[in-house]
Design a protein with these regions (language model features):
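Conserved donor-binding loop and adjoining core beta-sheet/short helix segment
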Residues: 10, 22-25, 29-39
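Short glycine/proline-centered loop/turn elements that form peptide/ligand docking sites
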Residues: 142-147, 202, 228-229
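Conserved beta-strand in the GNAT
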Residues: 28-31, 82, 91-92, 159-162, ...
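A generic structural motif
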Residues: 33-34, 75, 97, 164, ...
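Core segments of cupin and vicinal oxygen chelate
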Residues: 1-25, 63, 71-78, 118-157, ...
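Acidic/His-leaning functional-site neighborhoods
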Residues: 149-178, 183-188
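N-terminal beta-strand motif that seeds the catalytic metal site of vicinal oxygen chelate
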Residues: 44-49, 94-127, 133-139, 172-175, ...
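Vicinal oxygen chelate
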Residues: 21-26, 47-87, 123, 176-219
C-alpha cells in the first residue's frame, strides 16, 4: 500500500510488534491486540502526543476529565501511556528515549503519516483539554467555508480538531497518510482487502482525500500530501 518495510519485535507484554519504515524513516508501529469477546472490530490507528514526562501528563489528563486506557509503562523506545479523553477519543502519550524526530523527517510526503485530526462533539472543550495535556497553542482558521481548530507548538501546526459530521460517529482521532492520488490509493486499498468508506470526490475536500478501512477494520485517511503545505 505505502511501500513500507517492517522490522519484527515484541510489545511490552510479549505480543507481536512490528516497526514500519518508509525509506529510512520510522513511521509507525503495529501491535497485536486480543480479539473482542463480542467480535467487535478493535483495530485502530493511535496517534501519540510527545510529552516531557508521561506520568505527569497522565495526571494532568485525569485531572482534566480523562480516564486511563493504558497505564504508564516503559517500552523499548521509551515510556508510553494512553488516555480516553473527556469526549471518549483515545490518545497515546509518549516520551522517546531517543528524543523527538528531526522536523525534516516528519514533513508531509507520500507513504508517511502526514496529519492527525480529532472528530469530536465539542471542539472548544477538546482544544482546551489538549492545550493543557500537551502544552499546545490553539488557533482557529477559516477552511472551505467553516472554522477549523489547530493545535500548534514551536510555530508548527501539529493536529486539527473538527466537529463530528454525524452523531453515529464516536469521537475519534483519524490518521492521514500521504498519497499521490487519493482515488487510486483507495482502489488499491480495496484490492488489498480493505473497504472504501468515502471515495475521493469533489464534494469531499475537492477530491484531495478518501477514507478507507484496512483488512483489520482500522480507519485511515488517504490524503494528497501536497495539499497540506498550507496547513503544516
Amino acid at each position: 500500500m505505502f511501500g513500507w518495510t517492517f522490522q519484527d519485535s515484541k510489545g511490552p507484554r510479549g505480543q507481536d510488534y512490528a516497526v514500519a519504515r518508509s525509506g529510512n524513516v520510522y513511521v509507525a508501529g503495529l501491535v497485536e491486540i486480543p480479539a473482542a469477546a463480542d467480535g467487535a472490530k478493535l483495530s485502530r490507528w493511535l496517534p501519540y502526543v510527545s510529552v516531557a514526562n508521561v506520568d505527569e501528563a497522565v495526571s494532568r489528563g485525569v485531572d482534566a476529565g480523562a480516564s486511563v486506557a493504558v497505564s504508564a509503562r516503559d517500552v523499548n523506545l521509551g515510556r508510553v501511556a494512553a488516555l480516553v479523553d473527556p469526549e471518549g477519543a483515545v490518545i497515546g502519550l509518549a516520551r522517546s528515549a531517543f528524543g523527538d524526530p528531526d522536523e525534516t523527517t516528519t514533513a508531509p510526503a507520500a507513504g508517511r503519516p502526514v496529519w492527525t485530526e480529532l472528530l469530536t462533539d465539542d471542539t472548544a472543550a477538546a482544544a482546551t483539554f489538549y492545550a493543557e495535556l500537551g502544552g499546545y497553542d490553539v488557533n482557529t482558521i477559516d477552511r472551505r467555508g467553516g472554522q477549523y481548530t489547530l493545535l500548534a507548538s514551536d510555530g508548527k501546526n501539529r493536529a486539527g480538531i473538527l466537529k463530528k459530521p454525524s452523531d453515529k460517529i464516536m469521537p475519534v482521532w483519524l490518521t492521514y497518510f500521504g498519497v499521490d492520488d487519493p482515488a487510486a490509493a483507495a482502489v488499491l486499498a480495496e484490492s488489498l482487502g480493505g473497504k472504501i468508506i468515502l471515495p475521493a470526490s469533489q464534494e469531499l475536500r475537492d477530491g484531495t482525500m478518501a477514507i478507507v478501512t484496512d483488512p483489520s477494520g482500522a480507519v485511515l485517511v488517504l490524503q494528497d500530501w501536497t495539499e497540506l503545505r498550507g496547513v503544516r
